[in-house]
Amino acid sequence: MKILMRADTHVSYSVPAEGTKANFTFSQVLAALSVSLCSLVVGFVSAYTSPALVSMTDRTITSFEVTKDAGSWVGGIMPLAALAGGITGGPLIEYLGRRNTILATAVPFIVSSLLIACAVNVIMILCGRFLTGFCVGIASLSLPVYLGETLQPEVRGTLGLLPTALGNIGILVCYVAGSFMNWSILAFLGAALPVPFLILMIIIPETPRWFVNRGQEERARKALKWLRGKEADVEPELKDLMQSQAEADSQATRNTCLELFKRINLKPLSISLGLMFFQQFSGINAVIFYTVQIFKDAGSTIDSNLCTIIVGIVNFFATFMGIILIDRLGRKILLYVSDIAMILTLSILGGFFYCKAHGPDVSHLGWLPLSCFVIYILGFSLGFGPIPWLMMGEILPAKIRGPAASVVTAFNWFCTFVVTKTFQDLTVAMGPHGAFWLFGVVCIVGLFFVIIYVPETRGKSLEEIERKMMGRVPISAVVNIKPFSFNM
């Protein structure tokens, strides 16, 4: 989670791995920042229930009763609504455009938070949370698609991780504010956060790719000029966009479902689905769930609110590292580091909790789970947290990008709901040690998935990625690891 700005009209960014300097305009930074402010809102509303439920269930603060069951739905309804939003968002970004779809979530975000803040019963809170989740689902797929289609290849990774950075800032703001605000005042704060994002989104243009898709060549040229700078020669890029669109049109069918499941499109779709699966089943919910217990085992007297704030700080620091490294090392290297860190820490955490339950005595090793916790969060936030979303906007073919992103986003939120709802049952059946080890095995499978199937997209234009993904030439190569061929 970092952004580089200067007072003049351009920002210079050097990519050492390529040995060249890539210049990109301040406009691209502004575009990335504008849509990333939406991610800040997403982070805030996603974290809302964690601090809010404490005061919401306190009858001395809340004028109406919020039962334990109702409280679980206040937290659990958002992933279901986000799933619905993900399904809806695909058609919206195709028909309204990427920018307009993101912009359209601003007012509902404000309304949903006001609905919660002014609630006089649980139904109003649930309606507000459902509307919030619906907008989160739409934003989840719209942001990476917009950034993927507007940013230059040399900085697409760096600026493409900006939504994750601001999303983690939103989570941190919610945790800190929630430590001294009750649920109603916290919701009023949530209603104010979309205002800057609403204002800035009006300034930035639609993506050139969407204009080309609509046959609006002149508007695409103007959008490219805005993004690349008035003095930039955008004709080669525009020509490449139009050629790519012509190729896509020549192969397209009218049936979207049939188009999605063509052999030529299954490869990028399955890679994106796989990354989302391994993201959600990597054990992140298990580790977060046991945060307070891990701190207690380390002999800490830190209260639960401060624990969540520490999680937010570690999250932010890791994503900040990712922003610095992603366009230098590439996506796959960060995924390798992320996966290996999670495998090791989940294995050790499983062993610690097993020994705690069955012996020998490990009370003197309280520092061990705490160290594993920090390393795990760092690893997840460095790779498997943000990169699946970034790559979704990079590898999905243009002709199916809307519906495919919709499927992938809905699948992600479905996995989130399944993991959240079944995790406690899993720990009862297997014990916490069994749950940690199971997630560790999933991460091992995920590592081989990345090695074999996931392509390296660093420094490549979307058109280049698409052509190579559609062909038989694998673009998945990192250091001296040669990928297996994957022809579908």
Swiss-Prot record:
One of its GO terms (molecular function) is sugar transmembrane transporter activity. Coiled coil: none annotated. Keywords: Cell membrane, Glycoprotein, Membrane, Transmembrane, Transmembrane helix. InterPro entries: MFS_dom, MFS_ERD6/Tret1-like, MFS_sugar_transport-like, MFS_trans_sf, MFS_Trehalose_Transporter, Sugar/inositol_transpt, Sugar_transporter_CS. Glycans are attached at N182. Residues 1-28, 94-105, 151-160, 206-268, 327-332, 394-402, 455-488 are cytoplasmic. This is Facilitated trehalose transporter Tret1-2 homolog.
